[in-house]
A protein has these predicted regions:
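Hydrophobic alpha-helical transmembrane bundles of multi-pass membrane proteins
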Residues: 1-167
Length: 167
């Protein structure tokens, strides 16, 4: 029952923190950031959901909600990474946070948590490179300039998505 409580409390903390962060940063509450805040809260608590109290779970989720907001801006605006739903931030950046906060509420070691983050990150990076290379050999991933100009809807499925806007 503690895991159920903490999971929901962290999601709530993530939503509230992401909404407040977007409000303070832009003057508006961004619904997409709220959704990413909920995901961030869930991701942040997942590494160790049984140990924290309900209040600690809210704080962990809120930390995830704030982090996901700034991480999405960093990847989108600074690095120019095409991540339309903020998945890298919500799952990657906040996932690292979630693993690294476990020692605050349990007897886990920060050093071992860091080793885990590096091992998971290294494995994921190498596995992704291999899979992407294989897929690209079988079927090129990048669309040509001509395909992009024509529109991927027409080149890939033979239908124009918005015929009212075509020439």
């Amino acid at each position: 029952s503690q895991v159920f409580l903490n999971t929901n409390m962290a999601a709530a903390g993530g939503v509230i923190a992401a909404l407040l962060t977007s409000l303070f940063a832009t003057g508006k509450m961004d619904v997409t950031m709220a959704i990413n805040g909920a995901i961030a809260g869930l991701v942040a608590i997942t590494a160790g959901p049984s140990a924290p109290s309900g209040g600690e779970a809210v704080f962990i989720g809120a930390a995830g909600g704030v982090l996901v907001y700034f991480s999405i801006l960093f990847f989108d605006k600074t690095l120019k990474v095409d991540d339309p739903v903020g998945a890298i931030s919500a799952h990657g950046t906040v996932g690292i946070l979630g693993v690294m906060v476990v020692p605050f509420t349990s007897d886990a070691s920060f050093l071992w948590q860091l080793y885990g983050v590096l091992a998971i990150g290294g494995f994921t990076y190498i596995a992704s490179l291999i899979v992407t290379f294989i897929i690209n050999v079988i079927m090129p991933i990048r669309a040509t300039d001509e395909e992009q100009d024509a529109g991927l809807d027409s080149t890939e499925v033979g239908v124009s998505a918005y015929p009212e806007f075509s020439d």
